[in-house]
Amino acid sequence: MKKWIFIISLIIIIATALSLCNQKTVQYPLMQKESAITQIDIVEISGYRTVSTGNFDSIRVIKNIDPSENSVFLTSFYNLPCKKSFGPSQECLEGLAVRFFFQDGAFQLVGAETSFYCSADNNWSYIAYYFDYDAFHQYLLQHKGQEDK
């Protein structure tokens, strides 16, 4: 009897492991506290306004800051290595985009969401981070109304 219980348990464990391996997209809750990104440093590189984080070399602004939309889009350079914060099933990054959300009428950062494309499964996955709000707020005040180069 114990032998059958062991065999059935083993089959269930193997089936569960296989189903987890076949998942193509890793979903994360908004504003995940466990993110490795805890600080944003604003820098300028070759005329592009960039955000340097602990996970990526640089992120280039591709959309003007628009108060009416209460958001700004950033994009990273391609062919970045995947980081552990994206989950164990992600092996590579083809591209990354970041959108920051703000409260109406004021450049107070209230959220941020990134989406990344992994060529291993041809799917977009989403993850969100906490940022250094004060640093990015100062950046917005300094660059408000300026166009991207």
Q: What residue ranges belong to the model's regions?
A:
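Function-determining sites in protein domains
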Residues: K3-L10, A15-K149
